């Protein structure tokens, strides 16, 4: 028996079903089911009655839940006391991030950080990667989320990888059928005029020895997606910059894959407060893959 199993039991009873508990705890439904099954196996009793109307505690489950809630309260008290010692109560964490990471990468990690360190307030600045670097240099933020690699003045950690995809009108090419460079060279492209992305796409395209026909250069990713939907051209964007992708647009893999690495950075020469290391622990312990569908 462990704290996580007790937290899951309490969440299932509170929400009334496994799927809602999974959503509340940011877990998969199968992980919730496995945790409850393991707890029941260990105790040798059925704690929850499952049915069409959800999950409800059995008679023994109600008694176990009362004790579990007391244990969870004691656990929270222990965490609170330890955080007081670490300086994580009443602290403040300042984060800078570029837009797609702030939208898709940061929220689940912030949610976990808030669970672990509820006494730390967080502020977020959204800017481009160069702006993230400058904010770190000037001491305006503690941690930055930005594409890697960066210069040696920063200590960095990889968080996830983001595939560049070809965006075409949904009727232009069958989904799942590979694209060739020769096929792509027939399209006019709406180029993503944004920091390192432009350079990465141009350099990658150059390896194909095909002409890149640029019809527009646009900085706003959502504008590019809308233009592709209207048949004004094709585009190559990091997937996280492209989502949500409307039905009129289809995302295809490049003939040769291209990824960007998204990571966290701190200024190597700066003295860091405890909340920075606590957040870095969350980043390191979080699964390294971010999936964005659409």
Curated annotation (Swiss-Prot):
Pfam families: HTH_1 (PF00126), LysR_substrate (PF03466). Residues 18-37 bind DNA. CDD domains: PBP2_LTTR_substrate. Signal peptide: none annotated. InterPro entries: HTH-type_LysR_regulators, LysR_subst-bd, Tscrpt_reg_HTH_LysR, WH-like_DNA-bd_sf, WH_DNA-bd_sf. SUPFAM superfamilies: Periplasmic binding protein-like II, Winged helix' DNA-binding domain. It comes from the Bacteria. Residues 1-58 form the HTH lysR-type domain. The keyword Transcription regulation applies. Keywords: DNA-binding, Transcription, Transcription regulation. GO terms for cellular component: cytosol. One of its GO terms (molecular function) is DNA binding. This is Probable HTH-type transcriptional regulator LrrA. It comes from Synechococcus elongatus (strain ATCC 33912 / PCC 7942 / FACHB-805).
